[in-house]
Amino acid sequence: EVTKPETINYRTLKPEMDGLFCERIFGPAKDWECHCGKYKRVRHRGIVCERCGVEVTESRVRRHRMGYIKLAAPVAHVWYLKGIPSYISILLDMPLRDVEQIVYFNSYVVLSPGNAETLSYKQLLSEDQWLEIEDQIYSEDSTLQGVEVGIGAEALLRLLADINLEQEAETLREEITTAKGQKRAKLIKRLRVIDNFIATGSK
C-alpha cells in the first residue's frame, strides 16, 4: 500500500519506499536489481530481498503493476474521457459535454429515477434542482421513493457498471440492420467499443 506522497529521492534518484513509485510495491526500477543493491544480475531471478523487500525481476513489470492499482476513490482517466473518440462518452451513449459536467462536479446525474415522474435515467441536474428534489424526498408527506443521484467519477462508475455488455451488443446489432446514415455510423462505433470490451474481458 502506498502510504507516502513522495516519488523519487532527489539525491539517489531512486524511488522512495512506500511512496508513489515504491519498488517494493511495483517492482524494481532497474532490471534484475533490488532497491538496496544486495541482489544484482539475472541469476537471482524471482528472489525477494530480505533487506528491502523488492523482488528481483525485470523493470518492465512496473508498467503492468501500475496499471492495476486500487484507489481510495474512483477517478476518470483523461485518456478515456478526453481522447478522440471519448470511450466513456461512447460507452455511456452520452454527449462528452454531459460526461465532463458529471466528472468535474458541475452537475448531478440521475442513477435511478425511482417513482419520480419528472426524472429520467442519466438526466443531468444542477445543484439547485437536486436540492429541491432532496427537500421533497425528506419532507414528511413525501411520496418519492427510490430516487438515486450521483456526481463525479463515482457516478460514472455506477453508470458503467449498469451496462450489460452482451445484451447491449445484441440490441445494437438489431438496431444497425434498420438504421441509416449518421445514426448507423454512431451505432457501429458504439458496438465496436463494446465488442472490444467483451473480447478483452474488461469490466
UniProtKB/Swiss-Prot annotation:
Transmembrane segments: none annotated. Binds 1 Zn(2+) ion per subunit. Its cofactor is Zn(2+). Keywords: DNA-directed RNA polymerase, Metal-binding, Nucleotidyltransferase, Transcription, Transferase, Zinc. Gene3D superfamilies: RNA polymerase II, clamp domain (4.10.860.120). It catalyses: RNA(n) + a ribonucleoside 5'-triphosphate = RNA(n+1) + diphosphate. The keyword Transferase applies. Disulfide bonds: none annotated. Zn(2+) binds at C34, C36, C49, C52. GO terms for biological process: DNA-templated transcription. It comes from the Bacteria. GO terms for molecular function: DNA binding; DNA-directed RNA polymerase activity; metal ion binding. Its EC number is 2.7.7.6. GO terms for cellular component: DNA-directed RNA polymerase complex. DNA-dependent RNA polymerase catalyzes the transcription of DNA into RNA using the four ribonucleoside triphosphates as substrates. In cyanobacteria the RNAP catalytic core is composed of 2 alpha, 1 beta, 1 beta', 1 gamma and 1 omega subunit. When a sigma factor is associated with the core the holoenzyme is formed, which can initiate transcription. Belongs to the RNA polymerase beta' chain family. RpoC1 subfamily. This is DNA-directed RNA polymerase subunit gamma. It comes from Fischerella muscicola. The lineage of its organism: Bacteria, Bacillati, Cyanobacteriota, Cyanophyceae, Nostocales. The gene is rpoC1.
